């Protein structure tokens, strides 16, 4: 492998790693989007997922009727649907940290159920200072059409 290809591969890996950290590792909000789940676990989301480049693994399991447990990059997260109108949000809580903060993520599953796309909410649009779920919901509704609301996409393919 020549040096430019090696540099490109390392940059691609760093980009994927940063996206993953943004989606799950950046748990920075004090409260979930909604105080309780808005729907039950979706069966098609359960399973093992691998990032498009094959370097990142995400395991999604049912914890309770309406709650998931996620294993990603050695960390555990609890997640549940926090849908707002037509937008499929998920409140993701970091279970490894003492402060147990939340990340806000929107997801999309391909029609064939083989590709899961995640995007985290941009904290420059939705400030970390939001202290209650009602104000979070209001801000998300207010910014629903704001193209800056979400970060870059991160895609995972379902393992067989």
Describe the predicted segments one by one.
Residues 2-14:
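Bacterial N-terminal signal peptides that target proteins for export
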Residues 23-26:
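C-terminal motif of bacterial Sec signal peptides marking the signal peptidase cleavage site
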Residues 28-44, 52-160:
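Calycin-type beta-barrel ligand-binding domains and close structural analogs
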């Amino acid at each position: 492998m020549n040096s430019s290809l090696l540099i490109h591969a390392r940059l691609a890996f760093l980009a994927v790693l940063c996206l993953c950290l943004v989606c799950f590792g950046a748990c920075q909000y004090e409260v979930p989007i909604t105080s309780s789940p808005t729907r039950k676990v979706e069966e098609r989301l359960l399973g093992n997922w691998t990032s498009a480049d094959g370097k990142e693994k995400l395991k999604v399991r049912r914890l309770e009727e309406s709650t998931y447990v996620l294993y990603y990059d050695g960390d555990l997260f609890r997640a549940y649907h926090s849908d707002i109108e037509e937008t499929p949000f998920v409140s993701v809580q970091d279970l490894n940290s003492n402060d147990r903060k939340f990340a806000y993520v929107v997801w999309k599953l391909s029609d064939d159920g083989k590709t899961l796309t995640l995007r985290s909410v941009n904290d420059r649009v939705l400030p970390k200072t939001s202290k209650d779920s009602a104000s979070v919901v209001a801000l998300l509704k207010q910014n629903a059409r704001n193209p800056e609301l979400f970060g870059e996409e991160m895609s995972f393919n379902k393992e067989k």
